[in-house]
Amino acid sequence: MAQGRLINSKNVKPFICDETYSSKLLIGDEVAGCEVINVNEGTLEARQKTAGGVHEQTEIYYIVSGTGDVWLDETCYHVVPGDFIIIPPGTFHYIDNTMNDEKFVLMTFWSRQEYNEVYFARKKAWGKSFKTIDEE
């Protein structure tokens, strides 16, 4: 039986995807020791935008800090801290922070770790999907 666990996001090592975006897997199956809803903290640098993508499963964004635009197909939503965005399967989406001088931080929620391509990048680079700042 899996044990409960406290995760402090400040102690989770960010995975640097590129010079514009970093990602922290806060909650995932490996971390929890059982199947869970996956939670990721993403940081998009000021004056940047993501490349965008399409996923097979629903994804949910929660905006933590910063303001920006989230595009879902041809629809643009201006978002602020406290907003949620529901991204249905098959929807092309990206984040545009090019008009802002501050970082854009969001939490992403999805059902299975395999539905997020950064999971595989972490596994390839680290041999696992989660690291603390104290690990090499």
Question: PLM features: what roles do these ranges have?
Answer:
Residues 58-59, 63-68, 73:
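Glycine- and acidic-residue-biased ligand/ion/polar-headgroup-sensing regions
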Residues 40, 64-65, 81:
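A cytosolic small-molecule/anion-sensing beta-strand core signal
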Residues 51-52, 70-71, 87, 93-100:
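Short beta-strand His + acidic residue motifs that chelate non-heme Fe in jelly-roll/DSBH
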Residues 36-39, 60, 86, 101-119:
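A short hydrophobic beta-strand segment most commonly corresponding to one strand
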Residues 74-90:
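Short acidic-glycine-tyrosine-enriched beta hairpin
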Residues 30-32, 56, 72, 99:
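A generic beta-sheet turn/junction motif
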Residues 1-36, 122-136:
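A short, N-terminal "cap"/entry segment at the start of jelly-roll beta-barrel domains
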